Amino acid sequence: MNMASEKISIGFLGAGGIARTHAFAINSLKYFYSEVPEIELEAVCSTRKESRDAFAAKFGFKKSLAIDEFIADTTINTVLILGPNKVHFEHLQLALEMPSAKRIYLEKPVCSSLEEEQQMAVIASKTGKQIQVGFQYLQTASVREALAFWKTGKLGNPIHFDLKYY
């Protein structure tokens, strides 16, 4: 089955700021592209039930699930890992174990340590699943402007740059 005719059933692991960005983008695809596969916003998973319920209602997800329910859900064939950085490794491990998940998108950072990265490489190579890593904010105008300002040297010689974008 090719991508144009396959129904994409998406599950989000995470319901915070970057998840809102992805939900908006997915819901907007049909306005920008003439040939978009059928996309179902199947389930959203987050630690707090109240926030995942609100997120599901706001963005049109069918279900709001706890992590164990999410991992067991066989209707999800595409997982977006959008939670806090510290849980990316754990969430990737869980997503790779989902029999129905064919595709996994992982927001940066991939993991928190070299050891996690090495474990991830081994686990991922055994599954044959498609995994993509992304960094969406890098291309936003505000981040590009902030980085350009940093590079001017007007801030001296910074050793760390922590940008919050809301």
Show which residues each predicted segment covers:
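Beta-strand-loop-alpha-helix segment that lines the small-molecule cofactor/substrate pocket
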Residues: 78, 84, 89-138, 153
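Short acidic low-complexity segments
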Residues: 34-35, 63-74
